[in-house]
Regions:
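A membrane-topology feature that recognizes alpha-helical transmembrane segments
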Residues: 1-286
Length: 286
């Protein structure tokens, strides 16, 4: 009996070592050229949503004022609480990954980010699609309204107006969504990631420069603690299979689009500086 147990343990160890060695062999070490291309591409991809998102934030705020809507702006208190809420969320996700199976969690996240990514991408594509589709094509309006209760006790749950061009945008976004859902390809991940980052820079608005300083200062401490003082951030980033980061393979010159040795940049490192830059642009426009 003891010999059988020893043989089983030995076989398991050998299989694990062989699998690890196979993975290390399959992963080609990054060359200086590959690293330069990967990190340079990440820099370019980080600049794109900040640049376009900042200009879109100017237009978004202008539209809100013209429509008489009250803009949702981050206050000093919100900025001070942001790192605390982010820390609680990050640690909560870390605990969830320690308790439950990573496969089931990522399955739920994949479905959630599929719908979220399709909507984000459709919003980004809307101005382009509206210019490409000729005005001669029919563009019927639709109004989606959900209310709860009746008569004077009605509570509006959803009030969304859209048209045929919006449906085209949703269709295009759904194509990329299915690609991400089925393949989890890094290009599909980046497309969704760029859409999330651009929407974040557009819609998250600071009210003053001091608010931005409070936010950036708090998140500076947040990053130092969770990245360098603990392994929580790294563990969550490696376990969290969702388009919350931009990636680019360092071995793309050797393996092409099937490369798997990725350099990565979190969307938070793009959106947070981006909303501060968008604030400065709105100040200049005024």
């Amino acid at each position: 009996m003891a010999e059988e147990v020893a043989e089983t343990i030995s076989a398991t160890i050998n299989a694990t070592l062989n699998e690890t060695a196979g993975n290390e062999t399959a992963r080609i070490p990054a060359t200086p050229e590959g690293m330069a291309l990967a990190y340079g591409s990440l820099v370019v991809m980080a600049i794109i949503p900040i640049f376009f998102g900042a200009f879109r934030s100017v237009r978004f705020q202008k539209e809100q004022r013209e429509n008489g809507d009250t803009p949702e702006i981050m206050s000093d208190k919100d900025a001070a609480m942001f790192p605390i809420i982010a820390s609680a969320t990050l640690f909560g996700i870390y605990i969830v990954f320690q308790i439950f199976s990573k496969e089931y969690i990522n399955l739920l996240l994949t479905v959630y980010f599929f719908f979220l990514g399709v909507l984000a991408l459709a919003h980004i594509l809307s101005p382009v699609v509206r210019k490409l589709i000729p005005d001669s094509m029919p563009n019927d309006p639709y109004h989606l309204l959900f209310v709860r209760g009746k008569d004077d006790k009605q509570e509006e749950l959803m009030n969304y107006e859209f048209d045929n061009k919006d449906l085209v945008c949703l269709g295009v976004g759904a194509v990329f969504g299915v690609w991400y859902l089925l393949k989890k390809h890094w290009i599909a991940n980046n497309i969704f990631g760029l859409a999330f980052a651009l929407n974040g820079v557009e819609f998250l608005q600071l009210n003053t420069i001091m608010t931005g300083i409070i936010l950036l200062g708090g998140l500076f401490v947040y990053d130092i603690f969770w990245v360098f003082a603990t392994n929580v951030m790294v563990t969550v980033a490696k376990s969290f299979e969702a388009p919350i980061k931009l990636v680019f393979p360092q071995d793309i010159l050797e393996k092409g689009l099937e490369a798997n040795n990725f350099a990565m940049l979190g969307l938070g490192d793009i959106v947070i500086p981006g909303i501060f830059i968008a604030l400065l642009l709105r100040f200049d426009v005024r």
